[in-house]
Design a protein with these regions (language model features):
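N-terminal secretory signal peptides that target proteins for export/translocation
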Residues: 1-9
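Bacterial N-terminal signal peptides
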Residues: 13-26
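Bacterial signal peptide processing site
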Residues: 29-30
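N-terminal mature-domain "stem" immediately C-terminal to a signal peptide or N-terminal signal-anchor/transmembrane
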Residues: 37-102
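Short coil/linker segments at helix-helix boundaries
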Residues: 87-147, 157-273, 279-309, 347-372
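Intrinsically disordered, low-complexity segments enriched in Gly and acidic/Ser/Thr residues
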Residues: 289-343
């Protein structure tokens, strides 16, 4: 994610220095093995049993939102792993599970914690050795804390990203058989790590999201993918990241059909009272705000009124988020709703690369919004 942030150069430099030192002193490790496939029935049983006896809590209060930025938090978590400060990582994971803190805008810290650990820090283009380093460090964490669910979930997240690295970004017909073997092997390793975590006492909401990422990479059928979502939402109903993961699964270029995401957003949000319903609608529909042709094609069938209400409720309850404002601006611009677009652009500090193709597209949309 290419965003500016206020972390000091020295902190980031120290992180990369630790990475370079570790890579220089460790031998090359090969993680690619052939695994026997775990039956889907076994996996679904683990999914159902994971939340058994779990007490569902009310949504986190807006008062849990902190002014700490996502970028600084992500950097700090990455540095702790590079320093092998596993004790502090355990404390953070426990705090995320019990206190359920949010960033301003409503983003769960727990989600960012595992995102930070799943993707290796690097300079320049990501290399295979970067993933090997990250996996090696997380494996040491697992060894030091064998009862840690956070360590095993982090390992799974790293392997799903490592699978994507093996596949590359080309279309399916450009991926070699060797790349597919690595992709499937690493996704299977991620699943094994999650099944191992399920046998531990600790329960973490991100376990389900990590399993959703496995389901996406293994191409689970819609019935099993939806069953996974339903079990996840039953465990932690306000962890909206589950719904965004499932929305990704439903995109027409993957496993869904045109119109599936707007229909899902309406179905999921309509079962909730306000303001939770419109907020969830905003969370799901905003996954389409990425300036990609298949996603943009889905937007005309969504409710701009409900989307706008959801954005306003998120901002009122959880505070202003530059990312949320960019998503709102993109959808308003797509609908040619000039007043809403103008309002959104007026509050945006920086362009979010996850939303816009680039500065030219962003500036053109902003110029349009600001014309009489």
């Amino acid at each position: 994610m290419l965003r500016r942030h206020g972390r000091s150069v020295s902190l980031i430099t120290n992180l990369f220095a630790l990475l370079i030192l570790a890579l220089a002193t460790s031998s090359c490790i090969h993680f690619d093995v052939t695994q026997a496939q775990v039956p889907i029935e076994t996996v679904m049983q683990a999914i159902h049993e994971y939340g058994r006896g779990h007490q569902v809590l009310p949504s986190p209060a807006a008062s849990t939102a902190t002014t700490e930025t996502e970028e600084s938090y992500r950097t700090d978590v990455s540095l702790l792993l590079a320093e092998e400060n596993f004790a502090e990582l355990e404390k953070i994971a426990e705090r995320n599970r019990t206190e359920r803190p949010l960033f301003v805008g409503g983003l769960w810290k727990n989600n960012v914690f595992f995102n930070a650990l799943g993707y290796p820090p690097h300079e320049g283009e990501t290399k295979d050795s970067d993933y090997q380093f990250q996996i090696r460090r997380i494996q040491k964490w697992v060894a030091a804390y064998p009862q840690s669910s956070a360590a095993r979930i982090s390992l799974a997240r790293c392997y799903t990203d490592y699978a994507d690295f093996a596949r590359g970004e080309g279309t399916a017909d450009t991926v070699s058989n060797g790349q597919w073997r690595l992709y499937n092997s690493r996704a299977a390793t991620a699943k094994e790590s999650l099944l191992a975590a399920a046998r531990l006492k600790e329960r973490d909401p991100h376990w389900y999201e990590a399993m959703q990422q496995v389901a996406f990479r293994e191409g689970w059928d819609n019935a099993h993918a939806r069953e996974l979502l339903d079990q996840a939402a039953g465990f932690e109903p306000s962890y909206y990241h589950y719904y965004r993961e499932y929305a990704d699964y439903l995109k027409p270029q993957w496993y869904g059909k045109p119109g599936a995401i707007p229909a899902f957003a309406e179905e999921a949000s309509s079962s909730l009272a306000e303001p939770d319903g419109s907020i969830l609608y905003f969370r799901i529909v905003s996954s389409l705000a990425c300036n990609c042709a298949p996603e943009v094609a889905e937007l005309p069938s969504v409710s701009l009124t409900k989307f706008r209400t959801g954005y306003e409720n998120v901002r009122r309850l959880y505070g202003f988020s530059n990312l949320n404002a960019n998503r709102y601006a993109f959808v308003a611009y797509t609908f040619k709703d000039k007043p809403s677009a103008q309002q959104a652009f007026a509050s945006i500090a920086d362009m979010e690369h996850d939303v816009w193709w680039g500065p030219h597209t962003f500036e053109a949309a902003r110029a349009w919004a600001n014309t009489p």
